[in-house]
């Protein structure tokens, strides 16, 4: 009988991955979802990007791009100051401008690969830009490129939103990680449809509700780690997997 075992085809960009213990690998494609002022999305972002226990020190200032339509978010100002992000890398959401950033990073990555080097790690943070439909209306736009193809250029993308349903299907299905605060049953139904790999929906719903029961607590979903599901301290949750 013929041996029809599927053999792995090596993608050169696979070597650009940075495996990490207990947190999602880089490059990461993450969604952080929680209600405004009642969750702690900005606090999560500061912890992730400033502390060495997470991603602190893994991105050079000139390779960090902060996209936000909220000029008054003090925590984002702290983030920009602490990371020494250039002013030219801080901007409101604009499809054209973000496309220019993506094209620039992709060109630089291609030059590095041609020279036999790994692309530098880049980070794009898109903070609370979903209320105007920027993360959902253009399914063929730059956000889709970031979540579908950004890994080839070693681009990590983190998007925050108040509702999971505000994200496009492309973003939702291409996430490698998510941090989810408590939400409505309607939102949870959509999350369950996308992110439940357990034996039953009931088990996933129970895990979600238990993980998000306390104020500012959340569920971590990390597809790069065994078991997928983690609590607010990034510790694995016992499941049927």
Question: What are these model-predicted stretches?
Answer:
Residues 2, 10-13, 127, 221, ...:
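Intrinsic disorder/low-complexity signal
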Residues 101, 240-241:
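Short, surface-exposed linear segments at secondary-structure transitions and domain or protein termini
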């Amino acid at each position: 009988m013929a041996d029809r075992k599927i053999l792995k085809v090596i993608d050169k960009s696979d070597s650009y991955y940075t495996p990490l213990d207990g947190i999602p690998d880089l490059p990461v494609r993450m969604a952080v979802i929680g209600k405004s002022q009642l969750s702690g999305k900005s606090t999560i972002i500061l912890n992730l990007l400033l502390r060495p226990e997470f991603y602190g020190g893994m991105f050079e200032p000139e390779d960090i791009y902060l996209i936000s339509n909220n000029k008054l978010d003090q925590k984002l100002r702290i983030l920009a100051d602490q990371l020494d992000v250039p002013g030219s890398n801080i901007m409101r959401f604009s499809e054209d401008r973000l496309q220019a950033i993506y094209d620039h990073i992709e060109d630089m990555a291609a030059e590095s690969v041609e020279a036999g080097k790994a692309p530098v790690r880049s980070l794009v943070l898109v903070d609370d830009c979903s209320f105007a439909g920027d993360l959902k209306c253009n399914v063929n736009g730059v956000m889709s490129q970031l979540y579908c193809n950004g890994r080839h250029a070693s681009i990590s993308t983190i998007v925050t939103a108040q509702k999971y349903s505000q994200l496009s299907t492309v973003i939702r299905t291409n996430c490698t990680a998510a941090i989810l605060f408590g939400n409505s049953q309607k939102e949870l139904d959509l999350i369950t449809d996308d992110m439940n790999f357990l034996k039953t929906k009931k088990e996933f719903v129970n895990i979600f509700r238990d993980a998000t029961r306390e104020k500012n607590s959340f569920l971590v979903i990390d597809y790069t780690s065994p078991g997928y599901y983690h609590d607010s301290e990034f510790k694995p949750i016992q499941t049927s997997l």
